[in-house]
Amino acid sequence: MKRFILSLFVLVVSMSAFAQDDYLKDIPATEAMSKKVAELFRQNKIKLAFDALSPYWPLPENEIESSEEKTIKYVNMLSDRIGSPIGILKVKTETIGDIAIRETYLVRYEVSAIRLKFTYYKNEDGWIVNGFMWDDTFSEEFE
């Protein structure tokens, strides 16, 4: 019995360590989320961008926080090199049937741009953030 209770406690604690506890209801909601986060990046409101994603992102909170901290550091460093942000641009939307979507945005700066990629996955409850990444290699978007 003690082993069962301990196992149940560990399961509950480990589940609560994950940030994701909500679902996006449809594709327009995923599109709105991507646009909102891209705009928050443009405004250099990185914490708010990660706060917007985390309820839908099934990663442990400490991993999201670590990614957020690194992103704040590097975006600030990049901004010194590539100037002030001047806008966002949606580059493309890719799909795998009706179960996965990847949206790509550029945050434009005076001298260059950074690329944001959002991947959403549809499960039985709705859409979740399956992945989010950003980099400064937007040139890979040329076809």
Language model segments and positions:
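Positively charged n-region of N-terminal signal peptides that target proteins for export
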Residues: 1-4
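Short, linear, compositionally biased motifs with a strong N-terminal bias
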Residues: 10-11
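N-terminal signal peptide c-region/cleavage motif recognized by signal peptidases
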Residues: 14-16
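Short, low-complexity N-terminal intrinsically disordered segments enriched in polar/charged residues
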Residues: 18-43
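Short solvent-exposed beta->alpha transition segments
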Residues: 25, 31-32, 50-99
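Exposed beta-sheet edge and beta->alpha loop/turn motif
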Residues: 91-143
